[in-house]
């Protein structure tokens, strides 16, 4: 476990999780526990040693947004019995402890939610993510909002907006969203992605999606052509040109004149 900038977290041995209260018996099964207090963003990599599979180690990469009054723990837990009964698992579950990460927020967590990005990878199929960062909405009164920027190694950058109330508007660097969830990507190799999740508005300087009722809309540019998948009628604006689209049950070519 490191800070997102690569600095060592300097985790220290702890027994703190063992005394979490009589109602949290599961903590008693954790061992090799270590803790660090930090308000910085954290990057964690869980790695399963795959010596018996040509050394193609399996990793789960985790990026978590930092918050004040937060502690992070690493630990080992007993093997996961349920997973051990699933055929075709990539490693022997019963012979491996479960790699464990715990984040604890002191004080009010509603306005300081746990925000994380997970990405699996192997040595032969390495991580596709270059960097993960987090941003706040420009609306000062918007508290229960999470903003994530994911930069991929292929040149794609995704800005992810998450709100608990889809009637609220979140703005960041010319992007405006009114939805529970939204993804806005840059253009890379003639491709681009916009997703509006249970919302009515997604606006960028050159592309926008508007609906009269909350809807799910996926707008994609593939090799220069635009495709749409929408649960409700919507108005699409691309480079100043408006296009009306009805409900589509599968990805449909959008006629942009």
Language-model segment annotations:
Residues 9, 19-21, 37, 99-112, ...:
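Non-catalytic terminal regions with compositionally biased, polar/charged low complexity
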Residues 4-96:
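Trp/Gly-enriched beta-strand surface patches
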């Amino acid at each position: 476990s490191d800070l997102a900038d690569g600095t060592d977290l300097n985790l220290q041995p702890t027994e703190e999780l063992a005394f979490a209260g009589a109602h949290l018996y599961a903590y008693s099964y954790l061992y090799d526990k270590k803790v660090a207090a930090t308000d910085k963003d954290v990057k964690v990599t869980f790695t399963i040693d795959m010596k018996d599979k040509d050394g193609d180690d399996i990793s789960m990469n985790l990026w978590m947004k930092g918050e004040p009054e937060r502690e992070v723990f690493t630990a080992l837990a007993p093997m996961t019995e349920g997973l051990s009964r699933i055929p075709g698992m990539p490693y022997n579950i019963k012979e491996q402890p479960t790699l464990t990460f715990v984040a604890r927020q002191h004080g009010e967590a509603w306005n300081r939610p746990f925000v994380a990005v997970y990405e699996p990878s192997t040595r032969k199929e390495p991580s596709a993510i270059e960097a993960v960062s987090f941003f706040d909405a420009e609306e000062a009164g918007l508290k229960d909002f999470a903003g994530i920027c994911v930069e991929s190694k292929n040149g794609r950058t995704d800005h992810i907006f998450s709100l608990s109330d889809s009637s609220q508007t979140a703005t960041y660097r010319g992007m405006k969203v009114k939805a529970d969830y939204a993804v806005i990507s840059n253009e890379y190799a003639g491709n681009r992605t916009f997703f509006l999740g249970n919302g009515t508005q997604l606006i960028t300087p050159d592309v926008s999606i508007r609906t009269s009722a909350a809807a799910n809309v996926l707008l994609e540019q593939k090799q220069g052509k635009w495709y749409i998948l929408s649960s409700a009628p919507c108005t699409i604006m691309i480079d100043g040109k408006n296009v009306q689209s009805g409900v589509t049950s599968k990805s449909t070519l959008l006629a942009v004149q």
